[in-house]
């Protein structure tokens, strides 16, 4: 089977984008792993599938598959910006604002005049059962912020160089655990990231964020993504980090997030308001690829 694809990137988070608006795609997890493979396939953090929506008032369905595992996931912020540019650049929609549905939410995308894309990421989710996060038996850590019920939670990591880390827990349509670090360059992301990702307190696993606060309007961030490992940028991770920082009293309502792949701007007016993410989205190249009869396992 031959597929036409578009390779895109948003702040270094890279994607294979597939157009399924004209004909449905029936790909397996092994097929998505093959497309994401950087040696045998195209290479990408995630594979994005563009489908028409059957929901009234919604323009497209946005599906996301991890390039490493082939599993479908709930949300990807950097991918959402690339999704918006793809439908605009390929003539699928000429609307300034596009509404799309994911597996668990609706989001609105806006292509700015300068080519950047702003995504309305909806309101963050703090209820532990909905993240999901099991806090049974845990005692929240004291902190110097003003969380108003939003707390830091200790995670025990037996055998790690850091036997315990304190994390802020929330969902941006997908689960996040954010910890504050002194220096993201020296933070043990490769060691601690996978331990947090697969921690038993997160029954569906979690994206592990490492945030360095530079000022009330600027942070540096690294994210070990669920099912993908560390990526150059994570849009939902940037949103989660800023929301956590605001609720803990560390950050102002609009913050520049410096990732290894580029700059994202996150704005959140507080409880009851959506999170707005603005950043770049670019097409790298297009091509065609034959799926092997037996995809790389």
Curated annotation (Swiss-Prot):
Main location, first listed in the record: cytoplasm
A GO MF term: diaminopimelate epimerase activity
Binding of substrate, residues: 13, 46, 66, 77-78, 174, 207, 225-226, 235-236
GO cellular component: cytosol
Site (Could be important to modulate the pK values of the two catalytic cysteine residues): 176, 225
GO BP field: lysine biosynthetic process via diaminopimelate
SUPFAM superfamilies: Diaminopimelate epimerase-like
Protein localization: Cytoplasm
The protein's assembly and partners: Homodimer.
Protein name: Diaminopimelate epimerase
């Amino acid at each position: 089977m031959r597929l036409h694809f578009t390779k895109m990137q948003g702040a270094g988070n890279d994607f294979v984008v597939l157009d399924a608006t004209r004909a449905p795609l029936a790909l397996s997890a092994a097929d998505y792993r093959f497309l994401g493979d950087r040696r045998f396939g195209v290479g990408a953090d995630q594979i994005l599938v563009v489908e028409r929506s059957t929901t009234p008032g919604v323009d497209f369905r946005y599906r996301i598959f991890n390039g490493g595992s082939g599993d479908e996931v709930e949300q990807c912020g950097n991918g959402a910006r690339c999704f918006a540019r793809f439908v605009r650049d390929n003539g699928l929609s000429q609307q300034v604002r596009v509404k799309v549905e994911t597996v668990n939410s609706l989001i609105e995308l806006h292509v700015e005049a300068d080519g950047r894309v702003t995504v309305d990421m909806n309101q963050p989710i703090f209820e532990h059962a909905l993240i999901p996060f099991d806090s049974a038996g845990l005692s929240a850590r004291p902190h110097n912020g003003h969380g108003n019920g939003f707390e830091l939670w200790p995670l025990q990591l037996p055998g790690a160089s850091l036997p315990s880390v304190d994390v802020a827990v929330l969902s941006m349509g997908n689960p996040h655990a954010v910890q504050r670090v002194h220096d993201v360059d020296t933070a043990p992301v490769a060691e601690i990231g996978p331990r947090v990702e697969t921690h038993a307190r997160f029954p569906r696993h979690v994206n592990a964020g490492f945030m360095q606060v530079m000022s009330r309007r600027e942070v540096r961030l690294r994210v070990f993504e669920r099912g993908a490992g560390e990526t150059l940028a994570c849009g939902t991770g940037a949103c989660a980090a800023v929301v956590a920082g605001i609720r803990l009293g560390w950050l102002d309502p609009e913050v520049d997030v410096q990732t290894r792949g580029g700059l994202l701007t996150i704005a959140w007016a507080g409880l009851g308001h959506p999170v707005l993410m603005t950043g770049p989205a670019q097409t790298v190249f297009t091509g065609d690829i034959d799926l092997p009869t037996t995809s790389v396992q």
